[in-house]
Amino acid sequence: GEALKEYGEDTQEGGQGSTSDTNASLFQMTVYDPSYKTPDWMKESVVYQIFPDRFFNGNKKNDDSKTTARGTEPIEHQEWGELPDNPRLAETEGYSGDEIWSNDFFGGDIAGVQKKLDYIQSLGVNTLYLNPIAYASSNHKYDAADFKAIDPMFGTPEEFKNFTKELKKRKMHLILDGVFNHVGDDSIYFDRYGKYETVGAYEYWSSIYNLMNDNSDLTKEDAIEQTKEKLLAEGQKFSTYGFHNWFNIENEIVNGVYKYQAWWGFDSLPEIKSVPGEAVDYDSELNNKDFADYIMYDKNSVAKSWLDSGASGWRLDVANEVDTEFWREFRKELKTNEKEEPLILGEIWDDASEYFLGDLYDSVMNYRFRGAMIDYLKNGNAKGAEDQLNAVFEDYPQ
């Protein structure tokens, strides 16, 4: 008689597969679009990542351009050779820090990067990837206060444009970090601390809830009208993009603050809410038309304005935590750029095979390669590194 064997996955990274009589584990078959074209300039790029505040201080005049960090937290100016304040230091004897881990600044800026371009090029680098440079309270800048403005501690808009012009002279490219899943609680969009002229979501809804909680007979609609009148009387302005409606803020106080949805529970990073609407038939950031216009659709949108200022593309932070339809639209909008085809790079940590159809990202951060290298260099695990790399080869077509 005939012998029947099934061949399937052996559940090991880079393994050879296995046979069984029945119920073999399924293996992945990668499907991709052979006409999927990515920017040619990126294919031979050697990329150098820079955390701007710690790279080089090229202009000491901008070191004092801000007086506070998040809320009323002070800004700490550290000496270049000092260690940043961090929880490990807090456990040491004689610790004298403030136990705030993101308010110490060392003065690195765009001018500093520009002054070191000869050195950077001597390493064979032709593309820079900068961690976020938009106006933000922290030193890491993943808590945007204003997406459209460069942080004054990094430089001015004119300095940034001069920087990108110099890069183009050198045939170099610039990738910026786009953090569009969340913002800072100290921002023009949220304004938890009441610092900005534009009405932010937290000051708006906290005022509404305060009125409702102080007067149980007051309807939500009346509280909204009273809040609008109050804020306008104070000289506040409502953004035409409706910042005050971008977030989920509830009438429930937790630790003295009205509860809101935040990235991984960090209250400094309120998340853009997904809502029902017409763009897609489920809750999505794309259905928030004002937000989508602001980030990508408008002629002077965040994504387009930075490209117009000389950037070559975007690395999209926590890309898998934003609706994929949002990124499909993002791609359509940016790929119409006539000056140069911009790069769209997703922060994806695991297998990215599902993105090979050419309608989302041009590529992703190669963290799987990173993991294999760290495993080998730190732990000396050559076999483990080989298995991880073989798994990448299996998943990604050449």
Question: Which residue stretches match the model-derived regions?
Answer:
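N-terminal structural segment of carbohydrate-active enzymes
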Residues: G1-H173, V183, I188-R192, Y204, ...
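Hydrophobic faces of well-ordered beta-strands that scaffold small-molecule active sites
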Residues: V46-Y48, L128-L130, L174-L176, W314, ...
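The substrate-binding groove and active-site-proximal loops of carbohydrate-active enzymes
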Residues: E91-A111, D143-P157, F266-Y294, S312-E321, ...
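Hydrophobic alpha-helical packing residues
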Residues: F147, D177, Y260-W263, I344
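Active-site-proximal helices and loops of the catalytic beta/alpha 8
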Residues: T164-R170, N181-H182, D191-E197, N210-K230, ...
